[in-house]
């Protein structure tokens, strides 16, 4: 009698974690690609990320998705073997145990760029306004620039934080040809092709205090937060003249697809997964 090979073990780790849709997403990716795997949610104490993650890998785990509030701690855990994107982001959302080495990557920016492409947005030559200067904003700057944006302006409620983020990005090496600037929310300017809300304002049923006149003809407003209904930022953008609005559900699926590729070497199709998740959100509303 032959024994079956052990299932490859993966998980998402965070606090809180019960809301995470990652197990469902990776199960659908696995079904698409014919891969057998086990994927679970792992809650970690706020002061116990390292111990929990190390125990998972010592028990044979092969990959972890990392969510709030542990992305910076994951960066430190994998500091010796970080991808260029993770170094720029200062955060890791994908940990991989491979050949006796713990590797760290950040797939958030790739997930965002791929979702913008799915939406039909022209990134080459685009003028982009990024609202927010926290970890979510930092994680997407480099991929957006590499995708061809001509101008990126960072604005934040605390303009000093926007300036600090721009300085850190400049020090790490901004791709040539990208015009950059930073300022306060009321210094956002106008005629932007893409406006991305990288703050958590919509989670609190609020929109950033942005001035009017932000949007160029045909512009997209994109909120990294997602839900069954349009977010406060999306509603604000529509009222201000944005031609298109989108939430961050596609970014969630896109970053998961990139993690799946890192782990398995196969690219799943996110479209069907996104359709299923959107239907689930509507049913839960």
Curated annotation (Swiss-Prot):
The gene is: aroE
Q: Where does NADP(+) bind?
A: 132-136, 224, 248
GO BP term (any one):
chorismate biosynthetic process
Catalyzed chemical reaction(s): shikimate + NADP(+) = 3-dehydroshikimate + NADPH + H(+)
Top EC class for this record = oxidoreductase
The cellular component terms of Gene Ontology attached to this UniProt record, alphabetical and capped at eight, are: cytosol
The enzyme's E.C. designation: 1.1.1.25
Instruction: Output this protein's name.
Output: Shikimate dehydrogenase (NADP(+))
């Amino acid at each position: 009698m032959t024994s079956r090979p052990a299932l490859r073990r993966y998980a998402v780790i965070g606090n809180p974690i019960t809301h995470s849709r990652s197990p469902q997403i990776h199960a659908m990716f696995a079904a698409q690609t014919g891969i057998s795997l086990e994927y679970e949610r792992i809650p970690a104490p706020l002061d116990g990320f390292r111990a929990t993650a190390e125990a998972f890998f010592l028990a044979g785990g092969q990959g972890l998705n990392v969510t709030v509030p542990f992305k910076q701690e994951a960066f430190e855990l994998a500091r010796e073997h970080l991808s260029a994107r993770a170094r720029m982001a200062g955060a890791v959302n994908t940990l991989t145990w491979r050949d006796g080495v713990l590797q760290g990557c950040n797939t958030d920016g790739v997930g965002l760029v791929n979702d913008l492409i799915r939406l039909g947005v022209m990134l080459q030559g685009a003028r982009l306004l990024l609202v927010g200067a926290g970890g979510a904003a930092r994680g997407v700057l480099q991929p957006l620039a590499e995708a061809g944006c001509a101008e990126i302006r960072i604005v934040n409620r605390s303009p000093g934080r926007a300036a600090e983020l721009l300085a850190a990005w400049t020090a790490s090496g901004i791709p040539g040809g990208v015009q950059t600037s930073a300022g306060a929310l009321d210094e956002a300017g106008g005629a932007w092709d893409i406006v991305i809300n990288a703050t958590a304002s919509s989670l609190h049923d609020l929109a950033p205090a942005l001035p009017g006149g932000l949007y160029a003809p045909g512009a997209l407003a994109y909120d990294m937060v997602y839900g069954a209904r349009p977010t406060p930022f999306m509603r604000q953008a529509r009222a201000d003249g944005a031609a298109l609005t989108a939430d961050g559900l596609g970014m969630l699926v896109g970053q998961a697809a990139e993690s799946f590729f890192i782990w398995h070497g196969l690219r799943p199709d996110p479209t069907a997964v996104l359709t299923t998740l959107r239907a689930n959100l509507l049913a839960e509303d």
